[in-house]
Amino acid sequence: MIKKFDKKDEESGIGSNPFQHLEKSAVLQEARLFNETPINPRRCLHILTKILYLLNQGEHFGTMEATEAFFAMTRLFQSNDQTLRRMCYLTIKEMANISEDVIIVTSSLTKDMTGKEDVYRGPAIRALCRITDATMLQGIERYMKQAIVDKVSSVSSSALVSSLHMTKISYDVVKRWINEAQEAASSDNIMVQYHALGLLYNLRKNDRLAVSKMLNKFTKSGLKSPFAYCMLIRIASRLLEESEEGHNSPLFDFIESCLRNKHEMVIYEAASAIIHLPNCTARELAPAVSVLQLFCSSPKPALRYAAVRTLNKVAMKHPSAVTACNLDLENLITDSNRSIATLAITTLLKTGSESSVDRLMKQISTFVSEISDEFKVVVVQAISALCQKYPRKHSVMMTFLSNMLRDDGGFEYKRAIVDCIISIIEENPDSKESGLAHLCEFIEDCEHTVLATKILHLLGREGPKTPTPSKYIRFIFNRVVLENEAVRAAAVSALAKFGAQNEPLLPSVLVLLQRCMMDSDDEVRDRATFYFNVLNQNQLALNTAYIFNGLTVSVFGMEKALHQYTLEPSEKPFDMKTVPLATVPFLEQKTDLAPIATKQPEKMVPVRQDIFQDQLAAIPEFKNLGPLFKSSEPVQLTEAETEYFVRCIKHVFPNHIVFQFDCTNTLNDQLLEKVTVQMEPSEAYEVVHYVPAPSLPYNQPGISYTLVRLPDDDPTAVSCTFSCTMKFVVRDCDPQTGVPDDEGYSDEYVLEDLEVTLSDHIQKILKPNFGAAWEEIGDTYEKEETFALTTTKSLEEAVNNIIKFLGMQPCERSDKVPENKNSHVLYLSGVYRGGHDVLVRSRLALADGVTMQVTVRSQDETPANVILVSVG
């Protein structure tokens, strides 16, 4: 009697998998049945299925046992059962890499490949190419050429796809089959034409001219396969992105013409390609949007989903271009497919007017509980974007988000909501109290440690600045009583910030910290003891240094420096200035609502600058330069499409700059050796040493370094322009083999000029409490001057220009200029080369142009002078 499974069993998978408890040893024992005569096709099929199942589940087969099973399986070629033979082909492909002497089946596969049974020929080709290596390929070359142009479409497709895989083993041999591939590309069969185009592109993709010619040929002659058209559109859009012609190119005209194709998949591919092209204007997007608008009313759910998802992407950059589709999108709100309805609403949230927000929020609340967490995150992202667009609607959004926060959901969903509320609080000061209240309510019953610590950190930063900070103390101390160690430690830090900034609350906070000093966890006790003693001193300087600002160094770098210090005992105390600064301030990281893996990294990963520090320290000439202060973003020194690609990264040390030149040779008939970049400075900078890249083979990047000493006599000379010339020895080589000539000749290539500016000497560091930091530094080295920015037309432009020029970190969200204001104060903080803290207060007034009063405070006189001289 067959057991009947109910629906729950079916969903959970109970009883639905007959191979669930297979054991490898038992299956290999069964494989001996292959040697029996006569062959039992039905039983052998079942055993082969078990072997394939185990292989695909990741079961490890030893070489000996795999080879034994493989040899037993080869006897099955004696059977004429079609299903068994095709299962043998599949098993050969799966066991090719784990068995020895698999080439024993070559003759059997070649026989099937050239036989009269069409049903065997295609699978035999695929299996044969799986076991063939570069030395055997020429032996089957004649058969492969014949198979590519075979009249049977399954045989031709198998040969084309196998050829594509064989290019990884022997590109040069497969390239000789290009004429056959071109013949196959004119086939009437849609799959053969698609696979032929794929092979042709793969053989020519490194030759831009050849790809362009291929595109021209097929765009003029036309194609019968919609799949091939889709591939052609993708190739064209890739070329278009690299081209300087942009949207005036014939390639763009071709993609646009595909919007009128009779196949829906081609129309969608063309629309998607246009939308994803960089720098597209609303006018150029219009035809693609019109097509997607038609798809919104399609009876096919897949088309409706594709259309609304793509329109959702367009709405992020060009909301006005999608406004014409609003009526169609509103019709999709009631779509039976919840994914389509969600995307329709989130698109409308991006394109709708301020007056439609309330209605849309009401509609989405009716079914938000029914959709998956993934789509709930999409809704939250749309709300976040809407808050930035219509700040006055923050109360509606906040209420909606708080309701979502109470619903059940996973970590990613909850994190997206928390991040969205935090971004609303940061963008709209009016929403701060209601936002903090919702977050306080959430942490009362929050199972995610990461979110609880994040919210406590926010409460410590923003809570003390609210009109009634005392109301948050209860929520924070509850965490100390009820939560795990990590959350308790975060709560202690938050309490300390309230005590440091609010004199009336200090006695209460000290009492609470004393209670925390009895905690069972070391970290919590240590924090409580440390903060209690700092707060007891009642000194602003101590509060600023140890409670407000915290560490500004790279934690990974500090760990390494401390380890090094313990290995080499010294009487000198450990100097924090030897530790590289953190390149990304901890509090500056922008809220990212894109889903990421919930698993947190177990080990601390070194950041970009820590990696550069290790790389440079390994070069003897740079070993004694001191700690790496800052590494710039890459600067491109050559145009795209030139013979050589060169970009530069500036590594700034206390008294030197190391210029790292990443060089790539794009000529396949040249090998470059002894590559250096000669630099001629315009100021008092001195070039000390060159470290050449030993060789640059075709398309393999190499690194050359130039070491420059900063001027000692004039510390304000921070800006300099270098003329750069790449010098090298050229050895011509054969493009096919890459073998170079014995002798070479010297040559050079002029690069773009390279500038060192003030921002290269300053590292961004965020000061969470700018006022306290300003008072702590004091006015010993304070400088002040007033400037007129006559060409600047708005306060926003002035703020952006100042931040970019100085390379400093905006504090107190002062980079955001309030609407309809004629004056503004910009607060900036950073660390000047050598480890000196520097703060800038810039008062801006808008009249005829912008008047700017700059006040600089620093721990040393040099940074203050440098900034005012550079600005002037």
Curated annotation (Swiss-Prot):
Membrane topology reported for the UniProt record: Peripheral membrane protein
GO cellular component terms given for this protein: COPI vesicle coat; Golgi membrane
Chain positions of HEAT repeats: 64-101, 283-320, 321-355, 356-392, 395-430, 467-504
GO BP annotations listed: intracellular protein transport; vesicle-mediated transport
Stored Gene3D superfamilies: Coatomer, gamma subunit, appendage domain, Leucine-rich Repeat Variant, TATA-Binding Protein
Annotated S-S bridges: none
Pfam entry (one): COP-gamma_platf
Location in or out of the cell: Cytoplasm; Golgi apparatus membrane; Cytoplasmic vesicle, COPI-coated vesicle membrane
Alphabetical UniProt keywords: Cytoplasm, Cytoplasmic vesicle, ER-Golgi transport, Golgi apparatus, Membrane, Protein transport, Repeat, Transport
Listed SUPFAM superfamilies: ARM repeat, Clathrin adaptor appendage domain, Subdomain of clathrin and coatomer appendage domain
This protein's record includes keyword Membrane: yes
InterPro entries found in the cross-reference section: ARM-like, ARM-type_fold, Clathrin/coatomer_adapt-like_N, Clathrin_app_Ig-like_sf, Coatomer/calthrin_app_sub_C, Coatomer_g_Cpla, Coatomer_gsu, Coatomer_gsu_app_Ig-like_dom
Gene Ontology molecular functions: structural molecule activity
Keyword Chaperone listed: no
Assembly with partners or alone: Oligomeric complex.
PANTHER family referenced in this protein's UniProt entry, alphabetically: COATOMER SUBUNIT GAMMA, COATOMER SUBUNIT GAMMA-2
Record's function text: The coatomer is a cytosolic protein complex that binds to dilysine motifs and reversibly associates with Golgi non-clathrin-coated vesicles, which further mediate biosynthetic protein transport from the ER, via the Golgi up to the trans Golgi network. Coatomer complex is required for budding from Golgi membranes, and is essential for the retrograde Golgi-to-ER transport of dilysine-tagged proteins.
Record-stated family: Belongs to the COPG family.
Record's protein name: Coatomer subunit gamma-2
